[in-house]
Regions:
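Non-heme Fe(II)/2-oxoglutarate
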Residues: 74, 81, 86-220
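Short, conserved beta-strand element in jelly-roll/cupin
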Residues: 225, 235-237, 247-264
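A short hydrophobic beta-strand segment most commonly corresponding to one strand
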Residues: 254-258, 283, 298-313
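A short beta-strand-loop-beta hairpin characteristic of the jelly-roll/cupin
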Residues: 259-278
Length: 359
């Protein structure tokens, strides 16, 4: 009995220490002191190391059979101070981009350093919204949940190419959905009923899938301002739901080309709710809180892709690409891409309405 009480006491003190550490690191005054050009690499380095151990432990507790928690810890531990210094140097470059300068002025900021020390999304401006709170909020990007497809030439190209893309999807579905995999979140949690057939994921090209859908791949790679981090056929099973979440950063628009859309499928982005239409593009900003429902008896499938926001000039895109690569294509993202590529069964229910077939 004594050892049980002793163990309980030790665990209680350990959790208290963790809580105090997190509170200290996130205290506004402390974070403003460390999130400067000089100290930011050290602050991020320490945070990643700490969150690696904590995140791995939490993942193991929640889903022990579905989580590669050891890889999460090892990926965080593989992050070096040099990686964080590189990220700092890119942020210095971003500070000088015209679009970002305009956003900083509107928000009363002089630099992007220290932006996470206060809730920027709660400051009224054309570039913020209370329901837009990604981990990286780039100032200067208009805050709009949805956009109209007619605003983008690339969206019109995809709508014209719908028959070719749908034909290749039907071929994949005729093979019992081989190539689809259960989607794993960045925390390595499985979303039941959400399956993806990946073309690109965190910069990793899925060669076999691209070869099976050559026209779809050709069309995507020919488009301007195409962003190769998340490109896939995205399916949602009957009566499944993707809970509210936000993307990692703003400045990138998400496109969905409706391929199989039974009645009863909806998406909420910020305060607004819409549904898809087969052969039509839906464009939205995934840095807003968003969630998806499929209330039907059939699978819902869209072609899912990313494009850089039109507010950025072409000469600004290379700097933004380096920033995205610095934090998304490091050790953590390699683990996430490898997990997505791993041989893992899907739970895709290939139940397609007859009207959705395209010859």
């Amino acid at each position: 009995m004594t050892w049980i009480l002793l163990a309980t006491g030790v665990l209680a003190w350990a959790w208290l220490l963790v809580a105090l550490t997190v509170a200290f690191v996130n205290h506004g005054r402390v974070r403003r002191m460390v999130e400067t050009r000089r100290w930011l690499p050290y602050a991020l380095f320490a945070r990643y190391r700490f969150m690696g151990v904590l995140g791995g432990a939490l993942a193991k507790l929640h889903v022990p059979s579905a989580v590669r928690h050891r890889e999460i810890i090892e990926a965080h531990q593989a992050i070096s101070l040099a990686d964080m210094e590189q990220l700092r140097d890119i942020v210095v470059e971003m500070d000088d981009l015209p679009t970002i300068k305009k956003g900083k002025e509107a928000l009363g900021l002089t630099t992007m350093f220290g932006m996470s020390t206060f809730p920027v999304h709660k400051r009224p401006s054309p570039f913020t919204h209370p329901m837009q709170y990604p981990p990286y909020l780039i100032p200067g990007v208009p805050a709009r949940p949805f956009y109209e497809a007619a605003e983008f030439e690339w969206a019109q190209v995809l709508e014209r190419e719908y028959p070719s893309i749908k034909k290749e999807l039907n071929q994949v579905l005729s093979e019992s959905g081989a190539g689809f995999k259960g989607y794993m979140s960045e925390a390595n949690f499985r979303h039941q009923g959400w399956n993806t057939f990946n073309f690109f994921f965190y910069g990793k090209k899925f060669e076999e899938n691209c070869e099976r859908c050559p026209e779809t791949t050709r069309i995507l790679e020919s488009l301007p301002r195409f962003e190769k981090d998340h490109i896939m056929f995205s399916s949602l099973n009957p009566h499944a739901r993707i809970p509210p979440h936000v993307g990692p950063m703003n400045g990138i628009l998400r496109g969905h080309l409706g391929l199989v859309v039974p009645p009863g499928c909806f998406i909420r982005v910020g305060p607004d709710e819409r549904t898809w239409e087969e052969g039509k593009m839906m464009v939205f900003d995934d840095s807003f809180e968003h969630e998806v429902w499929n209330h039907s008896d059939f699978v819902r499938i869209v072609l899912f892709m990313n494009f850089w926001h039109p507010c950025f000039a072409d000469r600004e895109i290379p700097v933004l690409e380096r920033f995205r690569a610095a934090y998304e294509r490091g050790p953590l993202s390699r683990v996430h891409a490898d997990n997505q590529a791993a041989k893992r069964a899907h739970d895709l229910e290939v139940r397609v309405p007859q009207k959705a077939q395209v010859a």
